Amino acid sequence: MGSAGLSRLHGLFAVYKPPGLKWKHLRDTVELQLLKGLNARKPPAPKQRVRFLLGPMEGSEEKELTLTATSVPSFINHPLVCGPAFAHLKVGVGHRLDAQASGVLVLGVGHGCRLLTDMYNAHLTKDYTVRGLLGKATDDFREDGRLVEKTTYDHVTREKLDRILAVIQGSHQKALVMYSNLDLKTQEAYEMAVRGLIRPMNKSPMLITGIRCLYFAPPEFLLEVQCMHETQKELRKLVHEIGLELKTTAVCTQVRRTRDGFFTLDSALLRTQWDLTNIQDAIRAATPQVAAELEKSLSPGLDTKQLPSPGWSWDSQGPSSTLGLERGAGQ
């Protein structure tokens, strides 16, 4: 029964990582729960083996002993003899989240760990909600960091913030095209852009493909960011630099991933669901979509030509900061 359960564990699934929990601790917890589930299954009936037992002959009044062939159960594979059937599982982690961040975290079990590499090579976008707080700056861009400056923010308006976000998105879209090595003059590049298939060819700095403000009530604001190749620290730095562009300061109070590629919050398992049955069901439900999305993302696209020169007005190495802006732009 345990082997049958293991065969249904190969694949990808998503969990919801709460803030304050390190990704490695989460991975170890999931592995432990899976091992408990596999080892809790009823062991198969012991195999019978033939043994020759010494005993008196049947129907004989004499005390002469003889060997008699007898079928007895073999306990050589019983858990009480050899220990648990499963002592280790291969559990891999996709795009990681640091301890302070929360949200969708993709895990792979068994052969599913190879699919994590495919997800990385597909350069899929991820969605975040990022909360900011105007009026102060810290050494690590987090609210609980060491305070280095306090400023006023009465002059900040929703219109000014939206203007800054539009400039950010425009500069990063140019960078996305540059790192994709596409010739913008070709029909193939246009069709790929329409289909949303433009991706960097290799590793690149953080690229923002979409950003907007969901909530603005100074000093608090909430951003929705769609990006790739990011770290959570870079997203916190983004909030800091937005504050500078607004002629004030800002710190990040929350980073929450709401989508990682084709995995969303709806498909992420809560902490109370990190058990064998729920994870098997999640892997089975995700398998068709994983296969379809990876095939679409990794399949050779339209023929493209490499640009000899990006031709942009800013540095050919990409934006020099998270914003890719000159100081004071967008005001």
From Swiss-Prot:
Q: Which residues form the active site?
A: 98 (nucleophile)
At the top level, the lineage of the source is Eukaryota
- Give the start-end ranges of region Disordered: 296-331
Catalytic activity reported? a uridine in mRNA = a pseudouridine in mRNA; uridine(55) in tRNA = pseudouridine(55) in tRNA
Where is the protein found, in the record's own terms?
Answer: Mitochondrion matrix
Question: NADP: is it a keyword of this entry?
Answer: no
Keyword Hydrolase among record annotations: no
Question: What residue spans carry the Polar residues bias annotation?
Answer: 314-323
Alphabetically sorted, this entry's keywords are: Isomerase, Mitochondrion, mRNA processing, Transit peptide, tRNA processing
Q: Which GO terms describe its molecular function?
A: pseudouridine synthase activity; RNA binding; tRNA pseudouridine(55) synthase activity
InterPro entries recorded for this chain? Answer: PsdUridine_synth_cat_dom_sf, PsdUridine_synth_N, Trub2
Gene3D superfamilies named in the record? Pseudouridine synthase
Q: Which GO terms describe its biological process?
A: mRNA processing; mRNA pseudouridine synthesis; positive regulation of mitochondrial translation; tRNA processing
Which is one Gene Ontology cellular component term of this protein? mitochondrion
Q: Which CDD domains match?
A: PseudoU_synth_hTruB2_like
Transit peptide boundaries, per UniProt?
1-10
Enzyme Commission numbers on file: 5.4.99.-, 5.4.99.25
User: Could you describe the subunit structure of this protein?
Assistant: Forms a regulatory protein-RNA complex, consisting of RCC1L, NGRN, RPUSD3, RPUSD4, TRUB2, FASTKD2 and 16S mt-rRNA.
Which family, according to the similarity comment? Belongs to the pseudouridine synthase TruB family.
Q: What does this protein do?
A: Minor enzyme contributing to the isomerization of uridine to pseudouridine (pseudouridylation) of specific mitochondrial mRNAs (mt-mRNAs) such as COXI and COXIII mt-mRNAs. As a component of a functional protein-RNA module, consisting of RCC1L, NGRN, RPUSD3, RPUSD4, TRUB2, FASTKD2 and 16S mitochondrial ribosomal RNA (16S mt-rRNA), controls 16S mt-rRNA abundance and is required for intra-mitochondrial translation. Also catalyzes pseudouridylation of some tRNAs, including synthesis of pseudouridine(55) from uracil-55, in the psi GC loop of a subset of tRNAs.
User: Can you name this protein?
Assistant: Pseudouridylate synthase TRUB2, mitochondrial
Q: Which organism is it from?
A: Homo sapiens
The top of its lineage is:
Eukaryota, Metazoa, Chordata, Craniata, Vertebrata
